[in-house]
Amino acid sequence: MKNHRNKTVRDVTKLSGKPLPETLEPSSILQGTPTEQWVTSKDLLEDGLPFIPEVMKDLTVFLLGNININSTHLFRADILYDSQGVLSTPQQKELSFAQTGNTSVETTTDAEDRVEPIVAAEVAGFNLTRTVVRRLIPRNPKLDRPLEQTCHFYEADIAPGSEGATQESRLRRFLAVYTPHVASKEEIPFYHPLLRALAYLYDFTDDAAEATEAGSGSGALSLHFLPYPEEALPTRLERTLHALLNTQIRLARNTRLSETTEGGNYNPSKDNVIPQHLVQNTYSRLKFKYGKDLCRDWVEDTEPTKHVFEDLAITAFLIELWRSMYGAVPGEERNEDGPEKYDPNFPGFVDVACGNGVLVYVLLMEGYRGWGFDARRRKTWKILPEFVQARLKEEIYIPKPFTDAMAERGGVPDLGVETHSGLFEKDTFIISNHADELTVWTPLMATLACPESPLPFIAIPCCSHALSGAKYRYPPPKASKPDSDKESSQHEDVDSEQPATGDLKALRKAKQEAQTDVGFYKSMYGSLTMKAISIAEEIGYDVEKTLLRIPSTRNMGVIGGRKRVTKEWRARNQQQPASDCNGDAVTESALDKAMAAVQRECSRDGGVEGAAKIWVERAKGIHKGQGPGNQRGHC
């Protein structure tokens, strides 16, 4: 679905056209004191809305942690307290993260970050139903400080014929009040409206006996706020209030009721592998440590900020992923910050098609042993430290099935550059970031490199290519039959829980998620992603997909082998015996499955030998360079 972040969804013909201060009136819902007067405006009200209160409540819960949707200056909001005990705090997420991975529980935050909620005010006719304390986290902590905020939820249900409702209709009301933890207006950061408190009120006149998301009733959403005494209302604040109201309505249109605690807009493929706050905190640290210098010294023809910050975001994810899998931590945390101070717990990485080498550089600087290769040397390599340059190789990957096929015809021709067949060291973690021709090869090369213990990997697809290297658009995956007894593997990592009964809400939720996936997989990028997943699963990988928080629309990460490797590494650390299995049989099975997939996928290009010839010819062109706009990565 297209993003209409800035689209106006309100009926602007109902607005007065006057400056907001001229339209203010006392709030009839929130009563203040002689020095605290809540106000609202008819220009801050939108009526005729079809959403039942449950939709607004669901959306409000979702926005509690995803405040970045309302402000580009913010990363997120961390939940510090929930009176219902439903939303997890960062400490609770870290503890769960440590228990399922190889992170030591002792390395998580020692104690809960306790912030007492502001006492809730009584609101006539309403019942207080929930209190949440959150901390707003800015994108630039050196410019803006975090801010705690108490959120109070109130509800009212007025029966037909009661005061405030008509004889025929029931009035249901939902009120959310947000109060920052500040002693004066000078403490309010730039990203927060200069207000003492802000409230959303949603009134729904329900004419239907049974509620639906678009029932026969009608709703009205209004904003109420508590300004500072004698403080003028600047134009910026007026724009902010209108934008907040508009965003709430726009998002409500796409909100589907959900049984999840995070709200109906929650994406099950986002933050499902690593907690959001861990990755973003690490990203902030890396950005301030490396971002400025890398952008300043950039020598490529491409835009530096896009590539630098994307690579730093991926690096942050990898650091936290490896913390979970291996118990490996950055050099700063080991008091060994500096070149070539590698964590002995980490087995090493290889960045295939490493491009500008920034990912390799930062990972090495952070204390993770590894190297990268690309078919063509980049100008950026020469500005990196010498020890990093030594680990960036100008080499072409020729898959072993191709070298074996060409061996019968005199071997691989001289390409004028070193070649290799991907025989990486045991336990090496493979990074395949926008590797184009190598994307679908990634799980295959990981298995062929070490069939007795296939290597773990992450692939971030970009441009679509066949195994021959030729550009190819994969067809969308076939939809599973409705009466199929087994669940389609492509959805296992999206939602592993199936409705235990014929509950309509649960069935509806499953149907919506399936429809969302179908739409994604019909695209070229979605079909490529699914192809990488299906190949990996076919040859024995337990695959997870996760939406990475990177500045790119090609942001789906396909992770293979994480769970198995995490379990194996935990057993090693605890000096437990390895699981009893027939190693030769496992190796032979993995090789057979990989070769069967290679032969099938290469059949469209004349078999393995024909695909090998295409691969070599394309590799020559990539090595020589094809001019700006046609090089790898310019899809």
Curated annotation (Swiss-Prot):
User: Where do the record's region annotations for Disordered lie?
Assistant: 1-28, 474-509
EC numbers: 2.1.1.211
**What domain of life does the UniProt record list for this protein's source?**
Eukaryota
Question: Which is an annotated GO molecular function term of this record?
Answer: tRNA(Ser) (uridine(44)-2'-O-)-methyltransferase activity
Record InterPro entries: tRNA_uracil_MeTrfase (IPR011671)
Recorded catalytic reaction(s): these are: uridine(44) in tRNA(Ser) + S-adenosyl-L-methionine = 2'-O-methyluridine(44) in tRNA(Ser) + S-adenosyl-L-homocysteine + H(+)
Q: Where is the composition biased (Basic and acidic residues)?
A: 480-493
Q: What is this protein called?
A: tRNA (uracil-O(2)-)-methyltransferase
